[in-house]
Regions:
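Class I S-adenosyl-L-methionine
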Residues: 2-14, 21, 26-118, 207-208, ...
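A contiguous loop/helix-start segment that scaffolds small-molecule binding in enzyme catalytic cores
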Residues: 4-6, 163-233
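Residues at the C-termini of beta-strands that transition into short coil/loop
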Residues: 8, 35, 62-64, 124-126, ...
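Short acidic active-site motifs
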Residues: 20, 82, 155-159
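General beta-strand structural signal in soluble alpha/beta enzymes
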Residues: 33, 60, 95-97, 122-125, ...
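Short gly/pro/ser/thr-enriched loop/turn and capping motifs at secondary-structure boundaries
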Residues: 38-41, 66, 127-130, 178, ...
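A polyampholytic, Gly/Pro-enriched intrinsically disordered region
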Residues: 78-86, 140-151, 213-224
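Class I SAM-dependent methyltransferase SAM-binding "motif I" and its flanking Rossmann-like core
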Residues: 102-165, 230-231
Length: 233
């Protein structure tokens, strides 16, 4: 039976790939790779490439960084149709994404157009916030604590509400309004309960803790902020 594989390649290092991800990558005939710019190499591909067959067909696909879902719906449908046709022709088809495919992944929008038409097999990957929390021995949640994961493109008033309401907060892709978020951390005196990581597990990884978060001006696209009010660094 034809199926499409979506593979989470984890945080940024090939060492963080799961054995299952490697097994699937090694058997693919066609691999779709999302890029944020038309001339950029996919970050996910750079992690996965050492495990691919020599004769694999790689299809880089540019996804414009816009929030108007109606405007880009046609792009996702076109890609879903192309992937489905490749799979129905007998090829092993894959799509790679950083982190986990079901957490703020581009593939989710493609999945909307595939889920009723063909089997999709998802291979989980390690999200950046899990990787860095473990690396720094910084608990995400314990006892009766709920924790919330939110995109930093959310309204700042909403982000402040979450910071007040929850004991543990993960803010994904904090590059856009990093300064405003840092001001909230300062306002609620949470600098010693906050961890900032950019480019987790990559060569240019940067981890910032404590009051150093106030002096960092060059926030990268792949920046995650973790706050735990019950745990001090």
């Amino acid at each position: 039976m034809s199926k499409i594989y979506v593979i989470g390649v984890g945080t940024g290092s090939k060492d963080c790939l799961t054995l299952k991800a490697v097994e699937v990558l090694q058997k693919l005939d066609v691999l779709y790779c999302p890029t944020s710019k038309s001339d950029n190499e996919s970050i996910a591909f750079s992690i996965a490439k050492d495990f691919l067959k020599d004769d694999i067909e790689v299809k880089n696909r540019h996804f414009p960084m816009i929030r108007d879902r109606e405007k880009i719906k046609g792009i996702f449908k076109e890609m879903a149709d192309e992937m489905k046709n490749d799979a129905l022709s007998g090829k092993n088809v894959g799509f790679v994404t950083i982190g986990d495919p079901m957490i703020y992944s581009t593939f989710i929008y493609v999945l909307e157009n595939l889920k009723d038409n063909i089997e999709v097999k998802t291979i989980s990957g390690i999200p950046s916030f899990v990787d860095v929390a473990s690396k720094m021995n910084f608990p995400l949640a314990f006892d009766d604590m709920p924790f919330i994961v939110i995109p930093s493109i959310a309204d700042m008033e909403k982000i402040e509400e979450y910071i007040v309401e929850f004991d543990a907060i993960v803010l994904m892709k904090a590059y856009k309004n990093y300064g405003e978020i840092v001001e909230l951390i300062k306002k609620y005196k949470l600098e010693n309960n906050t961890l900032v990581v950019s480019n987790s597990s990559r060569e240019n990884e940067k981890i910032i803790v404590g009051k150093d978060i106030y002096t960092d001006e060059n926030c990268e696209y792949l920046t995650t902020i973790i706050i735990n009010k019950r745990w001090k660094l």
